Amino acid sequence: MSDISKYTPMMQQYLKIKEDYADAIVFFRLGDFYEMFFDDAITASKVLEITLTKKEAGQTVPMCGVPHHAAKVYIQKLITKGFKIAIVEQTSEPGKGLVEREVVQLITPGMIIDDDILPKNEYNFIGSVSLSEYGYILSYADISTGDTFILNGLTKQALTDEVSNLKLKEIVLTNTSDIYLLNFFKQESILVSIYTNQEVQNTRIVRNLKEKHLKEAGSLLINYLEKESKLDLSHLMPFESVIVDQYMRLDHQVLNHLELTESLTGNINSTLIQWIDKTSTAMGSRLLRYELTHPLKDKELLEKRYDYIEAFTQFEPRNKLESILEQVYDLNRLVGRVSSNQTHARDLVQLKTTLSLIPEFKEVLDSFDNPLIDEMNDKVDVFETLFQLLDASIENEPPLTVKEGGIIKDGYDETLDEFRSIAKNGDLWLEKFENEEKERTGIKNLKVGYNRVFGYFIEVSKGNIPLIQEEFGYIRKQTLANAERYITEDLKNAENKILSSKDRADKLEYEIFNQIKETAKTYTHELQLLSQIIASVDKYISLSKVAEMYKYVRPKLNHNRIVDIENGRHPVVEQHVEFIKNHIHMKPSEIFILTGPNMSGKSTYMRMFAVITVMAQTGMFVPATSANLPIYDAIFTRIGSSDDISGGKSTFMVEMVEANDALTYATENSLILFDEIGRGTATYDGLALAQAMIEYVHTQIKAQMMFSTHYHELTKLSEKHDLITNLHVKAIEQKDHMVFLHQVELGSSDKSYGIQVAALAHLPDPVIKRAKYLLKKLEKDGKGIDHNLFMFEEKVELGQIIPHDIQDLLNHINDLDINQMTPLDALIKLKYLQSLSKEKK
């Protein structure tokens, strides 16, 4: 630190604190404001759009500030932009000398406990990344709810997919050596923090983790949170070890293409979650959203979820539960705030209100008379002792502040009641004293007042000052423009007694509040279990209600890789337009080549299939009259046109990257959906690539696939392969316009109707007429169409195609950044590749 002696003691205090929090914006408490100085002030003033001014502190320094009572709004804005905030509070009473101050909390995008700043229906995860000989380890937690998870053995691709899907707000790394990951986190706007302590200190949270490398990986995150947040994190639950293989793989691109939780256009009504989330609580909504992005592969677990949906179809008790749940507060985050000592009395009132509903909640669950629901209900505790404590002690409408009284009910504590009685009688005494002084002095507008600087006083207007006589015993205390303020010995004695009792009452009330809070904290983990049950009930009620509203059916699951969907619908599209139902009947390893005009519904048909599959493997009923589905290990999509300007990738390049992902990682148990691959390049190139991809999937991967295209030449592949089937979306020409029937049938489309679609878009008539003329000429001359690639197919022997599993191993090797690896990293990676090689054998 440079010489700080030229600054005032207060500014020196600030600079010493800032040195320890160089990467954070320091909110420095001065009276009723948080002030920021130097570069913090310059940055914050721009982001917050507040005035940048100057402060004299031995030297002139840049300064800006925000009111203490409105700080949350400003903190939220900074957090949203990815900043860290160090909150500095006064920790000693004002007196002689400099008031002591210290950082009481570090708020970062991943370390938020305040419900006013957090998104209500989403988790707010912070994660850490470690590398072991088994691959990457991702630990993540939401400190507002106490949930903690850990995933082991991830590839770099799987790691980045999961980070995107979880929408991590902050990531903790042990070093900055992996440039690829750093660039990825930057692109995703994820705050990166560096921390190295992996020593196992909190054994409770890592107790479920058996292997040493997992305990250390989990400890990296927990140690960082405990050191940096300065919160009591006893509410964090033991790590839940997530087995990657139990979930269907959905990368971030698939989530985007299918618009499960986020819209491509920013329109929330185009997302699936908007139409299936009928939950009544924030807890249920968060659970539903999380499960939707983590579909299962376990048939037994999925069947149990379906059973729960059926169990909650009883209309009357379900409605009663809904009305109860609508009154339930966010118990999970309430418990988090109470446990982390970031609570106020209103949180305890909300906790009491929620607990008051549990006996009826339990009673209604019992009325379903269903063994599955009974099993859930048996775990519900009514917390009678805690409820009675809160009901007897906390006022129903307490203030937000916890140190200025008004929290504890009369009659709860005898000593507190005694202090309050003295203070109350003091108020009566003051009222009587004022009336007596008016009578004694003859000054009718005399009044008795109070302020924190001078205490109690008698105020007399300027015009009545001559009426003050010496025998009144008035001692001048303060001169105002229009009045004088006085005290008397009697008033001074009363002040000492009244203020003493009020001060003692406030301090005792704060002590009692803390005792009650500490008692509530002892129920933390039991309350978390209750919140999980409430969330599950809420989720199943929502899914049961949605199934009835939209006529969804329970899917059947098979291990035969057969698809039979009767009258399938897209659950979002049908909310906006009348939807034409379609069937999907697919054999194992079958490939559908789908042709038809633009706007005819090819992409919607493919999306419908994918969304129905995701819904089924999330444990939901699906939009169809019947559905028999395989359990997929992954869905790969390339649907719609997009580019990546920030990444320097064209539409065609993005197509190829996403196609490569599918061709590299798909298995025979995967579902691949490609929409018009190859359109972004020359016709020959695009057609050749499309045919090569279809053949590769058919011969090497053997996954089920839908491939929509305008290359009608590809439909000839069905003549050579039994498991390649042509489908088309029906459309008919009527005079000079097109009618799209949106029905998918066997066979191929005879043409693309591109000019007719252009006419529907109201292109100028001269353009349409010229296009029709040119098309006829091209068809007559045989130029530009019917490029038959099949005459060349023998030039590439099937045996020359690298087997899929070997290609996977080669991709791992090609992904290595040798320039960034240490010798130890190289040995770890070599061992990992060796294990992969043994698996392939």
Swiss-Prot record:
The name this protein goes by in its record: DNA mismatch repair protein MutS
Highest taxon of the lineage: Bacteria
Alphabetized Gene3D superfamilies for the sequence: 1.10.1420.10, DNA repair protein MutS, domain I (3.40.1170.10), MutS, connector domain (3.30.420.110), P-loop containing nucleotide triphosphate hydrolases (3.40.50.300)
CC per GO annotation: cytosol
Family: Belongs to the DNA mismatch repair MutS family.
Primary gene name: mutS
SUPFAM superfamilies (alphabetical): DNA repair protein MutS, domain I, DNA repair protein MutS, domain II, DNA repair protein MutS, domain III, P-loop containing nucleoside triphosphate hydrolases
GO terms classed as biological process: mismatch repair
Taxonomic source organism: Acholeplasma laidlawii (strain PG-8A)
